[in-house]
Structure formats: C-alpha cells, structure tokens
Amino acid sequence: MHFIDQAEIEVQGGNGGDGIVAFRREKYVPAGGPSGGNGGRGGSVILVADPGLQTLLDFRFQPVIKAEHGAKGGPNHRSGASGADRLVRVPCGTVVFNAETGELLGDLVGKGDQLLVARGGKGGLGNAHFLSNHNRAPRQFTKGEAGERVRLRLELKLIAEVGIVGLPNAGKSTLISVVSSARPKIADYPFTTLQPNLGVVPHPSGDGVVFADIPGLIEGAHLGVGLGHEFLRHVERTRVLIHLVDGTAADPVKDYQVIQQELRAYGHGLIDKPQILVLNKIDVLDPQQVAERAQRLSAAAGTSVVTISAIAKQGLDPLLQRVWQCLGRGSQQPAQLDLVGAKSIQS
C-alpha cells in the first residue's frame, strides 16, 4: 500500500430542494388555497476518523465529494425529503485545513471523531408559506439554497507516543523491527524508508506503546531537501523522541547536530520534546571506540547516551526502560523481547 499523507479535495454540500407552487384540488372545493410544500435540506459532507485507515491514498481517486441534494416540495403541503449526509472516512490523525485560506478547520484524532466540512443548503419555501390576508392565492416560491463548496487540504499526522529520528541509514527501521512487530523494508543504503512505519511495542502493563520510525532526515529537511519536511509533521504528536545516531559514522557529533538543527528550524515545539540520545551499531566497534564516541556525543549534547546495537539486539532493555520512564510508565522490565544488556554513558 502506498503511503499518502497529504491530499487536496473539494467537498460540496447538497443543494436544498426548491419549494413549489400548488393549490388544493379537491372535489367540492373548486377554489382551494395554496398547498405548495417546502423543499428538503441538502445533505452535508462530514469527515469521520476511522482507525482502520492508514493513508489518504483513496482521495487521489475522488477529488470531488458531494452530498445528496434535497428533494423539491410536493403538493398538499408535503415537504421534500432531505438529502442524505455524505460520511467520508479518514485516518485517525488527519488534520483538516481550508486549502484557500489556510484556516485550520479541525483535527480528527480519536475513533469516530467527526467534522462537518460542507453544510447542505436550506430548502426553498413553497407558496403555502406566503399565504396572507392580503394574498389568498400566492404564486410565490423560493429556490433551495446551494450547498457549501469548500476546497480542503488534508494532512495526516501519525499518532505515536514515541518517534525515532536520525539521519538516513542510522538504523531506525532495524530498531523498530526488533522491538515491535513492524516489518519495514531494511537495507544498507540511505532512504530505504520512504514512508513512516508504525510498530506497537509491548509494555508489562499489557498496553502497547506505538513507535513511529520517521524516514531519514538530512540537512535542510525543514526546507524540503531530501525527503522534505513533510515527514517532520509526524513527529509533532509524539511525546518522546529516540534520536538515533550511527556509531560508525565519520562524525557522530555532527550527525547529531544536523538533526537537532532540523528539529529546531521546523518549529512546532519539536526541539522541546524529551529526547533519548542513542548511539547505534556498537556491535562493529571495539569497546574503546564505543566509550570514546559515546563520551564525545554526551559532552556535545549535554545528556546521557544509551549505546545499542539494534541488529544484534544489544542494549534494547535499558533503552526501553528509559522510554517507559519518559512516558511516566514506571521502571518495570519490558515485555519479553530476548534482549541483551548494554551501557548508558553519562557525561
């Protein structure tokens, strides 16, 4: 399935039905009064959050979404039927903007959340409405109102408590694959991950914690360089960031600083989120190299560094302990993951 996290669509409420002109035509009532009924209300377009959807791909194929029109009025004071509302399913985490003004219209986070985005038009009035002492046989009626027509921009922000960030090839996909049931594409070259991956990591309480592997960011990502800043929006909902640094890189400190600058430049409070700094790929380094690189990274960042090897499953237990603590979930042992111990180096 292709992951599409942005879409533009046009939504249109149904038109209200027209009122009509009619008069009573009954036996023994040769000059009956006006009896034209009112038109029905047009249907509205309503977005509904559905946890079963993970992408906005479907909207590529239905750029215009319309609700049903109201029916015109009938004789004998019968009102026209209202048009059916159009319920449109979107993934949980969809943020809705007016595409023309940029106005934020709503944020559909939880299952069943609804947002009315295009209201149906009111029905017109039949001639019975215009009966008065001065006009006993009105022929006046009104047409139904047009439904609202709005162009929307939809943006999907994944709902995850923990986001994994880092430069391409830092090992983010490997990490999420070994701590959860997620199975992202993994290879030893940059930009293997072209879409965010979600994985549920078990917690001893029985609850699952959702982790998101954010595709590799590079210098200038907040300006759209590389895979662009479109993936940074997925970090906005997270509560904790795991900042993964490749321990085999030529300059791990510089790699750390690049990502920090991108988070800071993007704004939206990303740089202020709690971060767990992690040095990955220690399985291909000797102990002295691990210690030296971790200490330099810790000194530059002003925080402790957890050292791990995602591919060798080393250090994942202490890492998850840090995650649970940051989430306020206590210091219980993580659920069984067949993990190997590792170190945390403090500056």
Curated annotation (Swiss-Prot):
Enumerate the residues binding Mg(2+): S173, T193
Q: Does the keyword Membrane apply?
A: no
List the Pfam families: GTP1_OBG, MMR_HSR1
Q: Which PROSITE patterns match?
A: G_OBG, GTP1_OBG, OBG
Q: Which CDD domains match?
A: Obg (cd01898)
Listed under GO cellular component are: cytoplasm
Residue ranges of domain Obg in the record: 1-159
Which EC numbers characterise this protein's activity in its record? 3.6.5.-
- The record's principal subcellular location, in a coarse class, is cytoplasm
Q: What InterPro entries does the record tag this protein with? A: G_OBG, GTP-bd, GTP-bd_Obg/CgtA, GTP1-OBG_CS, GTP1_OBG_dom, GTP1_OBG_dom_sf, OBG_GTPase, P-loop_NTPase
GO BP field:
ribosome biogenesis
Write the record's keywords in alphabetical order, separated by commas: Cytoplasm, GTP-binding, Hydrolase, Magnesium, Metal-binding, Nucleotide-binding
Q: Where does GTP bind?
A: 166-173, 191-195, 213-216, 280-283, 309-311
Domain spans labelled OBG-type G = 160-328
Cell compartments where the protein resides? Cytoplasm
Query: Which Gene Ontology molecular-function terms are recorded?
Result: GTP binding; GTPase activity; magnesium ion binding
NCBIfam families with a match to the protein in the record: Obg_CgtA (TIGR02729), PRK12297.1 (NF008955), PRK12299.1 (NF008956)
- What is this protein's function? An essential GTPase which binds GTP, GDP and possibly (p)ppGpp with moderate affinity, with high nucleotide exchange rates and a fairly low GTP hydrolysis rate. Plays a role in control of the cell cycle, stress response, ribosome biogenesis and in those bacteria that undergo differentiation, in morphogenesis control.
Quaternary structure note: Monomer.
Annotated family: Belongs to the TRAFAC class OBG-HflX-like GTPase superfamily. OBG GTPase family.
What is the designated name of this protein? GTPase Obg
User: What is the native source organism of this protein?
Assistant: Synechococcus sp. (strain JA-2-3B'a(2-13)) (Cyanobacteria bacterium Yellowstone B-Prime)
The encoding gene: obg
